């Protein structure tokens, strides 16, 4: 190969490697957790549009009959920059959750998640300073500032 061709090929390879290495960073600010059974899940993510904490619970179906049938909706609680509340969610998460054993705590993406012994998750959204509970019911314990 000629030196120019080799340099161009090396440059293209380096550029492709840089693009490939940068691709996972799009999800680097996404943190997904669940209780040990996997029936209560939370995803915390940051985008250019803002910060979101979203938690869903299969356990809360009795407390939230408006969020049925199971194949279409799930009880949820959501924290965003300008809104905190409960709703029925109809989408999945972007990645599989990390299962938390009871009494464990994880932090990431602007939230701290505590796995309670009964399977509920308590989430302190440290960006909004909101406290939510998701499990047997979905609740906003403190709406934040």
Which role does the model predict for each range below?
Residues 119-134:
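Short, exposed beta-strand-loop hairpins at the edges of beta-sheets
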Residues 10-20:
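Bacterial N-terminal signal peptides
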Residues 37-39, 108, 127:
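Glycine-centered tight beta-turn/hairpin loop motif at sheet-sheet or coil-to-beta transitions
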Residues 1-11:
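Bacterial N-terminal signal peptides that target proteins for export
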Residues 19-34, 39:
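C-terminal region of N-terminal signal peptides and the immediate post-cleavage residues
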Residues 35-67:
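Short, surface-exposed binding/anchoring microloops in extracellular/periplasmic proteins
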Residues 54-100, 130-145:
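A low-complexity, Ser/Thr/Gly/Pro-enriched, surface-exposed linker/loop concept
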Residues 91-122:
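Acidic, glycine-rich flexible loop segments
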């Amino acid at each position: 190969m000629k030196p120019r061709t080799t340099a161009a090929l090396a440059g293209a390879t380096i550029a492709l490697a840089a693009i490939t290495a940068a691709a996972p960073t799009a999800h680097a600010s996404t943190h997904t957790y669940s209780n040990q059974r996997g029936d209560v899940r939370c995803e915390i993510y940051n985008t250019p549009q803002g910060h979101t904490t979203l938690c869903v619970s299969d356990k809360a179906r009795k407390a939230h009959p408006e969020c049925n049938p199971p194949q279409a909706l799930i009880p949820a609680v959501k924290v965003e920059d300008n809104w905190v509340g409960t709703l029925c969610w109809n989408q999945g998460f972007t990645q599989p959750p990390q299962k938390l054993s009871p009494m464990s705590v994880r932090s990431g993406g602007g939230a701290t998640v505590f796995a309670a012994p009964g399977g509920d998750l308590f989430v302190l959204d440290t960006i909004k300073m909101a406290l939510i509970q998701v499990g047997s019911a979905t609740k906003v314990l403190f709406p934040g500032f």
